[in-house]
Amino acid sequence: MTRTVMCRKYKEELPGLERAPYPGAKGEDIFNHVSQKAWADWQKHQTLLINERRLNMMNAEDRKFLQTEMDKFLSGEEYAQAEGYVPPEK
């Protein structure tokens, strides 16, 4: 049976992650309060931010920005958008 969590972002019971995505307390918090759907949505958004804002993951400021935006995104707060991105038409 799939483990479910009360997703902090979507405010409903959804399938949880199979393992913590980070070590330590932050990873445990994400594991216990973020659904697979929210995490997958974050990974897509993270890729957009890295590409559109030309973030360098070797740069500590860029990593800190991304970490802050992840916290906002997963908490359902207002978060940074990828400027200039136009989603493909369906």
UniProtKB/Swiss-Prot annotation:
GO terms for MF: iron ion binding
Species of origin: Pseudomonas syringae pv. tomato (strain ATCC BAA-871 / DC3000)
Pfam families, sorted: Iron_traffic (PF04362)
Signal sequence range: none
Assigned protein family: Belongs to the Fe(2+)-trafficking protein family.
GO process annotations (BP): cellular response to oxidative stress
Purpose of the protein: Could be a mediator in iron transactions between iron acquisition and iron-requiring processes, such as synthesis and/or repair of Fe-S clusters in biosynthetic enzymes.
Domain of life: Bacteria
Keyword Iron: yes
Entry GO CC: cytosol
Alphabetical keyword list: Iron
InterPro entries hit by this protein: Fe_traffick_prot_YggX (IPR007457), Fe_traffick_prot_YggX_sf (IPR036766)
Keyword Iron in annotation: yes
Protein name: Probable Fe(2+)-trafficking protein
